[in-house]
Swiss-Prot record:
Role according to the record: Essential for the control of the cell cycle at the G2/M (mitosis) transition. Interacts with the CDC2 protein kinase to form MPF. G2/M cyclins accumulate steadily during G2 and are abruptly destroyed at mitosis.
Annotated family: Belongs to the cyclin family. Cyclin AB subfamily.
Annotated spans, Disordered: 59-107, 164-184
Name of the protein in its database record: G2/mitotic-specific cyclin-2
Subunit structure: Interacts with NAP1.
Alphabetical list of Pfam families matching this protein: Cyclin_C (PF02984), Cyclin_N (PF00134)
Modified residues (N-acetylserine): S2
Any one Gene Ontology cellular component term annotated for this protein: microtubule organizing center
GO molecular function, one term: cyclin-dependent protein serine/threonine kinase regulator activity
């Protein structure tokens, strides 16, 4: 038989321990001012624990303040623990006072309160005290002072930090800016650019002829412009243009070569424009043709085969995607077969010893355009004027660099630009206005003469080339009619 007194004590101990656990959970979750049930109001163990909590509340917070004096924190915790034991209250092992993380908060992280479910607060993932300024308010706050105020501060601070993470960073930056307010800062961050270096060119007597600027210095960081080697490259091209220059007197061994060449070149311009090939392809094709005709005597009925084979060779040399030999054969209307074009290709290459290293005039024109600020109108007009030296028989034997310089000089005159200055002289290869005069007059004569190469003029009448042929012819007729000197015009 069980003793009724022992049963009563066991039941009281069971109910008091259960109630004690509830109170401890609420106290650890920052819940105070709890309303106790009337049925358990007279419980002596609960009354003792409540009085103990009130005494602790008067002495200070149960949660130790985060200071660097770890000895005082551990001493206060031990005294509070001893007080609870003297009153007959057994604390669980996972009590806040026995938690190792809270005994040394300076080296640990504190979990912020993020959600409240069924009157129970949850302490989730770690949030560093050094990362969040609002966490300090949570730790320093007394958990036994008001449920509403403590919970709202914790919840709002964490939510604001999640929704507006930039605000906390902005506060830190503002604090840093206040500390750095005494530092001097630069007034302007504009970096001054160095002006191009200028060089002077003098004659044999030491008299200054012209002054030019080093425009290649601005392309030092551009690997495609190869500014380190550009002077050596064009020096080599000027040497090479003399070697690959056809001779006009060698072409006179053919009968009626002047008229026949005009017809053939006009047809090649048509095919070249129809296939949409590069300008370099046409220049190389006609250079190969003139050099070949200067070495070999060709019958009149085979002249079209020579022109077709030369254009086929040039397209394979210059183009990325060259038209097939079938396309070239179809443009001759049966005058040349595919096998004949192949045989002509082999014979021409053997005659020229496979030397196709021709300094294209477009390279010299692009070089001069650098001194002209790469003006698109000047270069488009210059391309039309430069191509005149390709189709007109009188220009055979003139250096491509000289023709390119004369074309740029004439295009600038048409647009009313300034004089031929030192930069233009240097980047054209050193051609002065006096050296350009004969070639410029030849271009003027072609513009005012009746049209012979209709396909060539029709090509440059399109909007793609800004109607360069129409503008040039009208300008030349007006200048010739009024008797203006093209070499001193607009100066």
């Amino acid at each position: 038989m069980s003793n009724p007194i022992e049963n009563t004590e066991n039941s009281q101990n069971t109910s008091s321990s259960r109630f004690l656990r509830n109170v401890q959970r609420l106290a650890l979750n920052n819940v105070t001012n709890t309303t106790f049930q009337k049925s358990n109001a007279n419980n002596p163990a609960l009354t003792n624990f409540k009085s103990t909590l009130n005494s602790v509340k008067k002495e200070g917070s149960r949660i130790p303040q985060f200071t660097r004096e770890s000895v005082s924190r551990s001493t206060a915790a031990q005294e509070e623990k001893r007080t609870l034991k003297e009153n007959g209250i057994q604390l669980p092992k996972n009590n806040l006072l026995d938690d190792k993380e809270n005994q040394d908060p300076s080296s640990q992280q504190f979990g912020a309160l993020t959600s409240i479910k069924e009157g129970r607060a949850e302490l989730p993932a770690n949030i560093s005290l050094q990362e969040s300024s609002s966490a300090k308010e949570i730790i320093q706050h007394d958990p036994l002072k008001g449920v509403g105020s403590s919970t709202e501060v914790v919840h709002n601070s964490v939510e604001n930090e999640k929704l507006h993470p930039a605000r906390s960073q902005l506060q830190v930056r503002n604090t840093e800016s206040e500390t750095d307010s005494g530092k001097k800062r630069p007034i302007s961050t504009i970096v001054e650019q160095e002006l191009p270096k200028k060089f002077k060119v003098c004659d044999e007597n030491g008299k200054e002829e012209y002054e030019w600027e080093d425009l290649d210095a601005e392309d030092v960081n551009d690997p495609f412009m190869v500014s380190e080697y550009v002077n050596d490259i064009f020096e080599y091209l000027h040497q090479l243009e003399v070697i690959t220059l056809p001779k006009k007197e060698d072409l006179y061994q053919h009968r009626n070569i002047h008229q026949n060449r005009d017809i053939l070149v006009n047809w090649l311009v048509k095919i070249h424009n129809k296939f949409g090939l590069l300008p370099e392809t046409l220049y190389l094709a006609i250079n190969i043709m003139d050099r070949f005709l200067g070495k070999e005597l060709v019958q009149l009925d085979k002249l079209q085969l020579v022109g077709t084979s030369c254009l086929f060779i040039a397209s394979k040399y210059e183009e990325v995607y060259s038209p097939s030999i079938k396309h070239f054969a179809s443009e001759t209307d049966g005058a040349c077969t595919e096998d004949e074009i192949k045989e002509g290709e082999k014979f021409i290459l053997k005659t020229l010893k496979f030397n196709l290293n021709y300094p294209n005039p477009m390279n010299f024109l692009r070089r001069i355009s650098k001194a002209d600020d790469y003006d698109i109108q000047s270069r488009t007009l210059a391309k039309f004027l430069l191509e005149i030296s390709l189709v007109d028989f009188r220009f055979i034997g003139i250096l491509p660099s000289l023709c390119a310089a004369a074309a740029m000089f004439m295009s600038r005159k048409m647009l009313g630009k300034g004089k031929w200055d030192g930069n233009l002289i240097h980047y054209s290869g050193g051609y002065t206005k006096e050296e350009l005069a004969p070639v410029c007059h030849m271009i003027m004569d072609y513009l005012v003469s009746p049209i012979v190469h209709d396909e060539f003029h029709r090509k440059y009448q399109s909007r793609r080339f800004m109607k360069a042929s129409i503008i040039s012819v009208q300008w030349a007729l007006k200048v010739r009619k009024n008797g203006y000197d093209i070499m001193t015009l607009h100066e």
